[in-house]
């Protein structure tokens, strides 16, 4: 194996600064002889920029960048004080404690959190805009009157990558108008046991079907590589989730153990990730 220094970061839409939250510092160990893509070293100029930002941050700010609170557990004043790197709306969570809030209320909260996150910091600490992430797996389903699309198990039955791409495009527009930057989707789990309670989130038990459909949703949400408007207006950040093997846990236990020959497991459960990466996730 080879050891590659690894730093993960994602761009926020409202700033030229890069998000320091959601990062892992340290080595990433990857197989040097593998049919999976090898991690690429980050750009040295970006490395230097990030190192400069981190060097000017207090321990408290660094910790806050790694925390992703749920919207019903904190306020804009808390954001102003702690400067969380990102936040999310979880199940049944809505702005100001109202899960049935109109889209305008979601946008209002997004603006409040963003403005709180970019207020000047004391002592010259860098200002890093926060990000809001949501689970819009088959449409922006947390919002009343948003479009709800068939779930992944049904879209997988169509084998229609263009249809899935258009679902992503429509979903991105509806997410953006509520002020949210980031979608926790696509789910590229390859379900192997129907007892798993999230089987409906999987496009198929066949990785050859999951891979192109997951990549298509990435393109729909973010825009295609080479498109000058990629990650611009009408687009949001995508996420290939959840983790290697989540669709193949023993007896279908959610977030359970995955056992078996590693090469056989990789052939099934790792296969969709290179396609999502190639699509720009």
Regions found by a protein language model. Give the residues of each.
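Low-complexity, intrinsically disordered Ser/Thr/Pro- and acidic-rich segments
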Residues: 7-15
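Acidic, Ala/Val/Gly-enriched low-complexity intrinsically disordered segments
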Residues: 1-3, 20
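Composition-driven detection of intrinsically disordered, low-complexity segments
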Residues: 6-7, 27
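Glycoside hydrolase catalytic-domain context in secreted enzymes
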Residues: 29-281
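Low-complexity, intrinsically disordered or signal/transmembrane-proximal segments
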Residues: 18, 22-25, 33
